[in-house]
């Protein structure tokens, strides 16, 4: 019955809970679901269903993630919760579950802890743009001054990592109490606090720009020459729209070239345009087959540039995940798989880091042997002889 009400006419936003272990992330996820279920805005998912997260494999990395969905009056949300700290690290670095914003859960009884800090840092690094804070376990704090102190600490921590700490919405409450209330079918004082939190999420986390509204980009997968028609490049459009007559650029590996789109085909049919998510063939005017190769991208003119040097945040696969069995050191030269191709690059480790063990996450500097279309937020895999040994995201372009 509840399924019928899920009409996708509301704007869609992806969020997730982050924060230190045992501060109540999963309980809050269950409480949000339970409180909104009393209003008929979602299906009830209990704590155990969320906590026993199925393991998924994303680029060969095992990640346990729970997905729940719910609605507020204004929006439709997909919400991610991870049971273990390592799962968060992997999830955020691989972008397995992209977040438009996050709810940072901090126990009011304990204040910010090491993983609180690490999750905020990761959010900054991997580009989670907005954070709303829930101070959980408010029922365990009798002292209003203590609550204020924790709030100040959290704001300071956010500011340290370049989030607007002073303007960040912070709502206090108790996920457990709200969950207990909701199970009786009522929204009491604790449930109201969860609704207040969701109202802040609605207000503070903007609706993300849809992929089709972003500048056109298509990674080149294959190149063909068609007699009498010219060169066709195929691939899946990552973002934006491409129309017949558009001027586009071919970026990466070699010097950037300009060309004009003379045709767009999908399943052998001629189209006026292709958009994000479509697998298409794009016919290019005056471009020779040998001018284009896998690993380049077709894009809107000036929207992305080729680079060889960048900083990245990476997760190194553990031995159990099929990764390396031994650490790597400064100067390690693996392949970086970006979109559709491998490019060799050398890794410099941060000062004071001697080596990186399988299962670690670390910030690295990379120099590629050929330029690739890159921007902050571009994801990549690190490969060695065709097998994935790490996953990462570009956090800063340096050259």
Curated annotation (Swiss-Prot):
GO terms for cellular component: cytosol. It is found in: Cytoplasm. Monomer. Residues 19-26 are annotated as: G1. The keyword Acetylation does not apply. GTP hydrolase that promotes the GTP-dependent binding of aminoacyl-tRNA to the A-site of ribosomes during protein biosynthesis. Mg(2+) binds at residue 26. It comes from the Bacteria. Keywords: Cytoplasm, Elongation factor, GTP-binding, Hydrolase, Magnesium, Metal-binding, Nucleotide-binding, Protein biosynthesis. This is Elongation factor Tu. PROSITE patterns: G_TR_1, G_TR_2. Signal peptide: none annotated. It catalyses: GTP + H2O = GDP + phosphate + H(+). Residues 10-209 form the tr-type G domain. Residues 136-139 are annotated as: G4. Residues 60-64 are annotated as: G2. Its EC number is 3.6.5.3. Gene3D superfamilies: P-loop containing nucleotide triphosphate hydrolases, Translation factors. Residues 81-84 are annotated as: G3. It is an enzyme of class 3 (hydrolase). SUPFAM superfamilies: EF-Tu/eEF-1alpha/eIF2-gamma C-terminal domain, P-loop containing nucleoside triphosphate hydrolases, Translation proteins. It comes from Wolinella succinogenes (strain ATCC 29543 / DSM 1740 / CCUG 13145 / JCM 31913 / LMG 7466 / NCTC 11488 / FDC 602W).
